[in-house]
């Protein structure tokens, strides 16, 4: 079915329909254009969002980069950024393949439609002009027929009139004959016009207009087909990016699944483990000795206000770990401020310190406190600490790791320089064999420079190896001290201090000595110190599991133990995050070995 046959008389309908089709095409182009703008704005907002939350140029030294949570978040942001890029591709595809092409096609369709309707209107105008000519010839024929009939009646009447002259009758007959001739000519012209009009009308309705209508039908069908293809381009633009978007979503899923809480905890240990030994138990400070002593002995034997107690107190405090952000000094003990009170209040002779200025006493107290605070600051590695080449400003464990990193970097640089030296030697040999390729002497400066770099790097490697060995020994010694100190709970302090008897015994010998504060403490006062070393000879702890040595280990460093491949060992302590595990051999030897050299089975 075609429009030329079925809709031969629906010219205006076809005109409205084709115009509606072009309007629909323009409407779809406008819709796609706004859709592309929405996609572009969406992609722009996504990129701005990613830029807002993406870390600013993270480096390998940033601690946050090493956590899986941060790495997953960065990967998630990168996937969102890639997703935004795919939305930009959708917007670009819609703008080029749909908006531009369909807009251009719409203009072509409008021109073609205009041409077809102009042709139809021109044919219709020609048919109307032919019909007007036919009407004119018809009216002329009708008029001439009436004039001829009138002239014939006039001639007949004059012919029958007896009073009319022969000339009048003859003139009337000639006039009637003329009118008859004119009517005959008008008839012939009318017949010719009618025949011509019928031919033109048949051509118009059966040939010319059907062809125009068929062209309009073909144009409209092509427009509809192209519009349908444009509808398909909308979905095709989405389908083209679906695989990449799927990969982005899969990457987001992988980023979510790559969060490893256990590993992050281990990373935190690796970043901030200091390697210091845990602080020891506080010693019992018996301030009742001041009360039990004789006032005269107290004033004569301890002119500096019981330096023994103050030394023991400072010694025990130095072992404490400063957990707080700010380490406030402990208030001075009662013995420091009031050690001379019994002598001043008693009836005996006054103490040598009784006449001293209280400000001088406080000055001595501040001198005893300030070094302790300084040791805390150096212990923690404060902000004002100056970084050194051997990283001694860091805690032992962090120092060991940084030295290990520096050593690995130097070894890589050394290997690179050695490879370059070998390459230069080979090039020099080639130049010596084939002088036309180059001058061997031109390579001497580069070879000398490479040799100098190698020597320098070797010295640095030796230096860092020595520092690393020292740092590892510090870590192992700190770990051993902590283990021996906390192998068993300490004994509770007794009510009677260990130096109570010795203080009264030694009081007589201190009467004639003004410098007793500079003498070492008595045996009773050293008892708590020896108690710490007695803990090293306690009964060995029971193993917590078994392990098998996968590789041979020499165990030449302090605190380590050697083992053979395939040897069965007893697991005494698990890895605390530093890569070492404490084991015991069947012969009884006990020490640390690398965790990666073991296959562990816990009880």
UniProtKB/Swiss-Prot annotation:
Record-annotated SH3 domain positions: 542-603
Annotated region described as Interaction with CDC42, given as residue ranges: 293-539
Start and end residues of each F-BAR domain: 1-264
Protein name (record): Cdc42-interacting protein 4
Domain of life: Eukaryota
PROSITE patterns (alphabetical): F_BAR, REM_1, SH3
InterPro entries: AH/BAR_dom_sf, F_BAR, FCH_dom, HR1_rho-bd, SH3-like_dom_sf, SH3_domain
Location of this chain's protein in the cell: Cytoplasm, Cytoskeleton; Cytoplasm, Cell cortex; Lysosome; Golgi apparatus
Annotated region described as Disordered, given as residue ranges: 295-358, 477-541
Family: Belongs to the FNBP1 family.
Entry text on domains: The F-BAR domain binds the phospholipid membrane with its concave surface. The end-to-end polymerization of dimers of these domains provides a curved surface that fits best membranes with around 600 A diameter, and may drive tubulation.
Region (Required for interaction with FASLG and localization to lysosomes): 471-603
Coiled coil region boundaries: 67-259, 388-481
SMART domains, alphabetized: FCH (SM00055), SH3 (SM00326)
